Amino acid sequence: PHIKICRTRQKTIAKLGGLCYNNKNILILDRGEGLMAKNKLVTPVVKWVGGKRQLLEEITQRLPKRVTTYCEPFLGGGAVLFSLQPKNAIVNDLNADLMLVYEVIRDNVELLIASLEKHENTSEYFYSIRDLDRDKDAYREMSAIDRASRIIYLNKTCYNGLFRVNSSGEFNSPFGYYKNPNIVNASVLRAVSKYLTANHVQLFHMDFEEVLRQVPRGAFVYLDPPYDPVSDTASFTGYNRGGFGREEQERLKHCCDGLTARGVRFLLSNSSTLFIQNLYAGYTVETVHAKRAVNSDASKRGAVEEVLIRNYGT
């Protein structure tokens, strides 16, 4: 169910902006110099609900100063991972299509770029590509490259970049009618591919609890689960079948208690609901504000109140 990537190269890396490594590949964060990635082209390749670009500064300010292994069980668009670019990482997402995209970027980026260049920005073509997953047998026969290309294309051309599937797991976001969507973005794809292949990054597709069992003592875990809804209509878990309700939130809290008992530091983001604040009452809970750009309702995009929860000091 998972794929392991190559070993990281052992070498000393000089300080680069707010990030540097020592000769043991321990990521050292100098929070006083702000956030600066080693390669600015290593950025998210897909737009994802709950993406953390708008919250990066708040997250980075609260990271522990030394990180030997970075773990992210709810990867999504990977904004935090790609900003930090750790040498040793364990990353995971329950969305199989999303993890396939990362595997193909790592293993076959040039063939992926060639496939993306063939796509058309028309409504008729969009729906023909979108509906490929209606025939389950035919969809399974598609190559990994074509399936990854399809997901990126749909993400770049669907309405507001909202990756959404129905109860049958079929992509159902409508066409976005964008004039010039950046479907290919080859420079970013190549940069992300280089990052994934040059470092010890492990890609997983499994339940978050299974991944967290593999995290070694002394590691750092960033948790960005589907958020607890602030109202009865606010929940969005359409990027995966099944959803993520209160029972899942409680199961995640139990995992966080287990991490703490094992000496693993974690930082968790979620919505600022009374349920979440009470659930994590024994931890450091801080309120922050983030701007949300992906929402099917345009009136609900904008600044929202969230919480960052951690089990370690500043």
Feature roles, as predicted:
Residues I13-G18, N22-Q54, Q61, K65, ...:
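SAM-dependent nucleic-acid methyltransferase catalytic core
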Residues F74-A79, L189, N270-L274:
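Short, polar loop motifs at secondary-structure junctions
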